[in-house]
Amino acid sequence: MLKRSHYCGELRKEHAGQKVILNGWVQRRRDHGGLIFVDLRDRSGIVQVVFSPDVDLEAFRVAEAVRNEYVLAIEGTVRLRPEGTENPNLLTGEVEVYASKVEVLNKAKTPPFYIEDGIDVDEQVRLRYRYLDLRRPEMQRALELRHKAAKAVRDFLDRHGFWEIETPMLTKSTPEGARDFLVPSRLNPGKFYALPQSPQIFKQILMVAGMERYFQIVRCFRDEDLRADRQPEFTQIDIEMSFIDREDIMSLMEEMIAYVFKEAIGVEVKTPFKRISYQEAMLKYGTDKPDLRFGLEITDVTELVKDVEFKVFQTVAHAGGVIRGLNAKGCAGFSRKDLDDLTKFVGNFGAKGLAYLILTPEEVKSPIAKFFKEEELRALINALQGEPGDILFFVADKPEVAAQALGNLRLHLAERLGLIPENEFNFLWVIDFPLLEYDNEEKRFVAMHHPFTAPMDEDLPLMDENPLLVRAKAYDMVLNGVEIGGGSIRIHRRDIQEKMFKLIGLSEEEAKEKFGFMLEAFEYGTPPHGGIAFGFDRLVMLMAGRESIRDVIAFPKTQSATDLMVGAPNVVERRQLKELHIKVDLPVKEQQ
């Protein structure tokens, strides 16, 4: 076999006159009678190869038979393309290689789709033939970026004294939150391991063990319904540190992210990042992961309108609800249908209606304007900085409904109005989360992040008096409206950890059975510690400018958690189940 001397995509005019050996795939073959042109592709790019009977007749004969995706080894001489035939769309467009020798290393069937960017092919087909899909340049660029980002993370953390330590993949099931993937133990019949949803407990134990600075780029597993863009197995950048406070972690993580963006995609990220409280995020943006690339802030006007004659506002305000609004600048031209569509849109998030004021130079147009005195109307318009040409939208409801409805309306309007700038990376931290929230279905408190998150020191007394007012030492990093990382300072005292377990409804026996080893470890000199975990797939997706994490994972699952290429999951042999002492009890529908 002819061994490669150069990659296809690296040839330039300075290589003219050199003899080279290339290995790659046939992207396209064109027969121009006396000459055959082959675009040869490898992971670095494409170069044009010319087969001429005058240079080598045998090579020319071989080229007559090659087809798309044949694997070739070619020896030839680099020449400048004749003037006027250069291809400015290729980095190699000033040169071509005249072949003097060729070997067909393998033939190929006609692929089910073209191996090129921008193809309109059903994703199921792409996933079924993932080995072909991954040949496309945009997919290879995404995986190269993933590699560069992972390397940058490792380089940065190594320089700052972190050790990469692996934690177990086969661990204990603690059914809190999402479902575990269970693995039966053949050697311990009737018992199961769980695949980790996160190395959370192990990384805290490593801090107890005195490792001080740990990290891992680690696979995690969650057996959950794959709503939106989720995967049953995903990758985290997992980090934990001892003898630090919240500021230490947040500032170091800003440095790390800035370093990764610079190294992987050449983008300068400004630090420090903006910080806002959870309360401010929910009030102004209707979400705890706001996109700050555009304005459209939400304003609470409850106090202004609680006593107006408009009964909807009055009733909601006096029942403990809120009235919030946002100003859609320059949208006074929206049609009746537009307004009806937006009302239906907020209805998807629980809102019972969408009130509006259309501001024109002459008047305020609105079915609700007649219920307001002139000074009340003026105060309301001023509160939202309204001007002629704007529409002011209002939702009156419970705080959580108003936040969700207007938060989603804000994003919807920004997309529709083209307010979201492309190629901009807007980072922020959301801090001061509540430690707990109340689950009305389960009738108990649940941890907003996880039960190992430490409360603010000054809020410790409130754990007994009013748990919902306790703030957490938690912090989420948000990029362009996507949460890319979440972390906290951890509880490191047994008494506080036991109190936390009790608050979320774990009995003393349950806490001991599930986390007894951890509680015991806390009695042997546990340092103050904290950490963070970044969703690596989502981070790379945003860096690559892609719409789905499936585009930055080599072998992703579908939304029904299947691998179309290998056919997983699959039915296993009875012998295997017998060895594991497992009987399968399928739902009736699946047995038929």
From Swiss-Prot:
Reaction catalysed by this chain? Answer: tRNA(Asx) + L-aspartate + ATP = L-aspartyl-tRNA(Asx) + AMP + diphosphate
Any idea of its EC number?
6.1.1.23
**Binding of L-aspartate: at which residues?**
176, 222, 449, 490
According to UniProt, where does the site described as Important for tRNA non-discrimination lie?
A: 32, 84
Gene Ontology cellular-component terms for this entry are:
cytoplasm
Keywords attached to this Swiss-Prot or TrEMBL record, sorted alphabetically, are: Aminoacyl-tRNA synthetase, ATP-binding, Cytoplasm, Ligase, Nucleotide-binding, Protein biosynthesis
InterPro entries in the record: Aa-tRNA-synt_II (IPR004364), aa-tRNA-synth_II (IPR006195), aa-tRNA-synth_II/BPL/LPL (IPR045864), Asp-tRNA-ligase_1 (IPR004524), Asp-tRNA-ligase_1_N (IPR047089), Asp/Asn-tRNA-synth_IIb (IPR002312), AspRS_core (IPR047090), GAD-like_sf (IPR004115)
- List the CDD domains: AspRS_core, EcAspRS_like_N
Look up keyword Lyase and say if it applies: no
List residues binding ATP.
Answer: 222-224, 231, 483, 535-538
> Which biological process terms from the Gene Ontology are attached to this UniProt entry?
aspartyl-tRNA aminoacylation
The GO terms this record gives for MF are: aspartate-tRNA ligase activity; aspartate-tRNA(Asn) ligase activity; ATP binding; catalytic activity, acting on a protein; nucleic acid binding; transferase activity
**Which residues lie within the region annotated Aspartate?**
200-203
Q: Where in the cell is it found?
A: Cytoplasm
Concerning Pfam families, the annotation shows: GAD, tRNA-synt_2, tRNA_anti-codon
User: What does the UniProt function comment say about this protein?
Assistant: Aspartyl-tRNA synthetase with relaxed tRNA specificity since it is able to aspartylate not only its cognate tRNA(Asp) but also tRNA(Asn). Reaction proceeds in two steps: L-aspartate is first activated by ATP to form Asp-AMP and then transferred to the acceptor end of tRNA(Asp/Asn).
Q: Which PANTHER family match?
A: ASPARTATE--TRNA LIGASE, MITOCHONDRIAL, ASPARTYL/LYSYL-TRNA SYNTHETASE
Q: How does it assemble?
A: Homodimer.
Q: What family does this belong to?
A: Belongs to the class-II aminoacyl-tRNA synthetase family. Type 1 subfamily.
In terms of NCBIfam families, this protein maps to:
aspS_bact, PRK00476.1
- What name has this protein been given in UniProt? Aspartate--tRNA(Asp/Asn) ligase
The record lists the organism as Carboxydothermus hydrogenoformans (strain ATCC BAA-161 / DSM 6008 / Z-2901)
Q: What is the lineage of its organism?
A: Bacteria, Bacillati, Bacillota, Clostridia, Thermoanaerobacterales
